[in-house]
């Protein structure tokens, strides 16, 4: 997590939380009409399964076996479409709730056939693509999609699309008549199907058992036809397809199944997006309760995209929904993820989604939903709310967690919690950028503080349904004063009194009570809150958000090299990456008056445009505990630093031991030198002998090189 220089507050005036209104002078992270496509930290995202939201145009509903009138069969289309979302944008339901971004189902054309199962399952969810360059006609036309984007932007709402380049649709290796045989089309022209795949557009390695990372990448996910991203046609097709949707004006992408695609290819995809028109991109890497995966952290830190924060979502569900953990476990997760993720503020948080049971339980206490939303909206990360959560919708498992939207009541307590805290999130940078500090804790009570410079938000939550707790000995960074609850007592929060030394007068926190107290003040020195994107090339534009930059142009440095300033305001700077060598750099801002911010670290400068190359080495025998890695003379291969070598390589699916392989994002059109090394669990390195391998990487396509281990 980004660290900033703590500022000592010496004011002794009495402040009230109503001073939050002074934030309007700052111009929040998003200015009206200037949607920030690379920073979502102050946003509230609302996830919509398009087919299950609103049927705004009955004329585009499918017929026959694809459709379920009245949505009695939840595995078929029910009629929701882009016009329905437009209607709810224009009637104020989303804007009044405080939604500033929507994440919608994959918009591409899906299969028109149904599965031969008990339900006759259809592609309503959008994950069974047949043509990534055409719209799903049951959601609307391309013109309808453009109207949706325009309507959202007119109301200050960003649009995120789901995108699932891992696969097409269900297919069978032995039965070409099964559904649509996974066929892939390019704007209406057939490229190929899963059987008789002479061009090798797909993988044919059987279904994954989820036994290893390699197994999940190079085998089929269930019965879905797994795309071969190293195929030059597939590589170019998918990259062109995503740029087509970017041309429609989208602001973000949720990348499906990132755990199941080659990391190297995905980094080259992110480079393609950043080269073209950067948008906030986050991937889906499912983690179960209490699961910690180092590969998950590595991907988030090295791929150029963020992730859905399953560690956050699962832990909050354990604490407030399932009672299988307590606030100590949650606080530990907050600390651990702050260390594990370089950009923890960019990870997308949630309490439920379309792949898990809804948070609200049939016959359960809606107060738990309210508490969970309050924590979600005041915690680090980009908060995402699943459609209908604000209406206390229930449903365990697919498809019961994807029912038709039940109602649009603006008076539910959950709706009002979102409304109030979305406003606070937009207007107090502590929620967008602040560190998190635990201030008071027991199994039932969690008091935590978010702080960014002088901006402070203090939150207290009591999950118990029966116990009252006296909160004594609490200290805060809030200046001395009286603070009213930002929720207006909606969850029974009260006023607190803060002394001159930061001590909070004792108060009671009742069962199910949540209190939120806030303070904000103008910064006089520069403080960086966010940089996006965090990967680029020399000349790429980068947006720096924060406070106290001043109105006169100052200096931005990548390491010790000054960048060309494109635009400068007190809260946002746009610069071009200076002419520096490839590598990772700290960014600093110096105001025109000479004051310098703390460093914002780990911006990655790539060598040039990236392509995905498969490196294969034969006859690389190893001892127990050893793995093969690749290292070379370019930054993307570690610059001969064995601690930065790429690997471990794979040896089970596409090739078998003692042949090893890995797909790596490398600079295009460049003659590179490399070698393979053996590493054991203690980090001991054995180099292959002989001369360096030499390879000239391709341009604008994928590549492959096969060599023998040199003994």
UniProtKB/Swiss-Prot annotation:
Its organism's taxonomic lineage begins at: Bacteria, Bacillati, Bacillota, Bacilli, Bacillales
Q: What is its main location?
A: secreted
InterPro entries for the chain: A-amylase/branching_C, A-amylase_C, Alpha_amylase, Carb-bd-like_fold, CBM20, Glyco_hydro_13_cat_dom, Glyco_hydro_b, Glycoside_hydrolase_SF
Question: Where does the record say this protein resides?
Answer: Secreted
Cofactor note text: Binds 2 calcium ions per subunit.
Q: Where does substrate bind?
A: 127-128, 167, 220-223, 254, 259-260, 354, 398, 402
Which residues bear the site annotation Transition state stabilizer? Answer: 355
Please state what the protein is called.
Answer: Cyclomaltodextrin glucanotransferase
- Under the cellular component aspect of Gene Ontology, which terms does the record hold? extracellular region
In this chain, Ca(2+) 1 is annotated as bound at: 55, 57, 60-61, 79, 81
